[in-house]
């Protein structure tokens, strides 16, 4: 239950939701996320660290860049469900 609570807390901010949406297509570095989300590098880094701390993201270093990806792809199923419930279904 504690893990579910941490997961839902991580989804409780628009930037973190945006990060998850951006990572649906594969791993990204901070600069890519900054471009996609239109917010500062420091803001994105803060949210990435929170998500890593909650075991939602993993990272790997390549040279001086750090790439992030979702630890468990089932997270996208939850994200899709939330989008269907709260954003409506375009096919309906």
Task: Locate predicted features.
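Residues within the DNA-recognition helix of helix-turn-helix
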Residues: 47
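N-terminal helix-turn-helix DNA-binding core of bacterial DNA-binding proteins
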Residues: 2-42, 66-74
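Beta-hairpin "wing" of winged helix-turn-helix
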Residues: 52-62, 69
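Short, hydrophobic secondary-structure boundary micro-motifs
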Residues: 32, 60, 78-79
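Short C-terminal domain-edge/linker segments immediately following a structured domain
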Residues: 25, 52, 89-91
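Amphipathic alpha-helical dimerization/coiled-coil segments
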Residues: 1-3, 75-92
């Amino acid at each position: 239950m504690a893990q579910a609570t941490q997961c839902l807390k991580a989804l409780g901010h628009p930037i973190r939701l945006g990060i998850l949406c951006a990572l649906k297509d594969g791993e990204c570095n901070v600069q890519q996320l900054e471009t996609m989300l239109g917010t500062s590098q420091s803001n994105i880094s803060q949210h990435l660290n929170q998500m890593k701390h909650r075991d939602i993201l993993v990272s790997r270093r390549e040279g001086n860049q750090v790439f992030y990806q979702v630890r468990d792809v089932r997270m996208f199923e939850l994200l899709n469900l939330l989008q269907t419930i709260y954003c409506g279904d375009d096919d309906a």
